[in-house]
Swiss-Prot record:
The enzyme's E.C. designation: 3.2.1.180
The organism of origin for this protein: Streptococcus pyogenes serotype M1
Keyword line: Glycosidase, Hydrolase
Protein name: Unsaturated chondroitin disaccharide hydrolase
GO biological process, one term: polysaccharide catabolic process
Amino acid sequence: MARPLKTIALEPIKQPERFTKEDFLSQEDITQALDLALKQVRLNMDYFKEDFPTPATKDNQYAIMDNTEWTNAFWTGCLWLAYEYSGDDAIKALAQANDLSFLDRVTRDIELDHHDLGFLYTPSCMAEWKLLKTPESREAALKAADKLVQRYQDKGGFIQAWGELGKKEDYRLIIDCLLNIQLLFFASQETGDNRYRDMAINHFYASANHVIRDDASAYHTFYFDPETGDPVKGVTRQGYSDDSAWARGQAWGIYGIPLTYRFLKEPELIQLFKGMTHYFLNRLPKDQVSYWDLIFGDGSEQSRDSSATAIAVCGIHEMLKTLPDHDPDKKTYEAAMHSMLRALIKDYANKDLKPGAPLLLHGVYSWHSGKGVDEGNIWGDYYYLEALLRFYKDWNPYW
């Protein structure tokens, strides 16, 4: 049964012809980009061995860390994507070794008191289960889902992002979690237990009705009253200001909505996707790669966030599977994702291959804290590689 979903603004796409100045990417374009990325992945395999990269680079060089960050599985996801493209058993073996580390992490409950269980267990263990059906990978993903539902708050109907459960100062969701709830849909499908699905759906509607603004932009986070569950206010933690639109947050919405649509099939979700996507496309600079916050445009001298553009490409590609050919925006969406990915390949993909280097340059991790500004980041690497594989073949999402 459909739930109430607020109506948001739908801006017309401005100057859609800007996305058709160049031809669509050819299979040769994609293959060349994948071959280059694969070379960097192989260099990084020797560099990281069975450890993991830090979330972002410093001077375009990852440091090496253990499996304790929220970002670690994006490297493992790069390995699974590279394995799908190459068929190289050495890549598969390292990815499986990584996944055993994730099984150990969830079994021992190491640094998992947050909402990012989907980011940790989808591109790693869920990917392995979908590709190889190894029982250990399924076990790890289901344990992670059980850990994630512990953060569900009945009052407000959402998964609390961070902090002490139920504490007023921490009683909020964040837009990123639209990707994390895909782990709960997976758990429901695998176990037949609708409890996971129900929590995911409740969280989705809490997000759609509150963290997404009426003008189709998004807050980063949204607070609820822990006593009543009533909505309180939207604030940022990563964006420029509480009133601006953090580019990566907007992209999480663009991707999270079509992923959730697969399970809900509610037409209102398409309109939600369109609103958020049009808002994003209308604020791209001339080279089609977003600044780190959509409040900035050409001439602002701010940093881009290439990872946000890579995520948006994946989201548009996912929704295009659903949109009928007669949809008035479908051709523009297709042209836009080709234009954005072409820009990433041409001007943002790392071509200076060396151990520990990123696949994708010019991202932003956290502007306010000065972390990873105009650097590579591992989720940018992952979503760039995912976008390439989506264009290369009929790819079955890990999400």
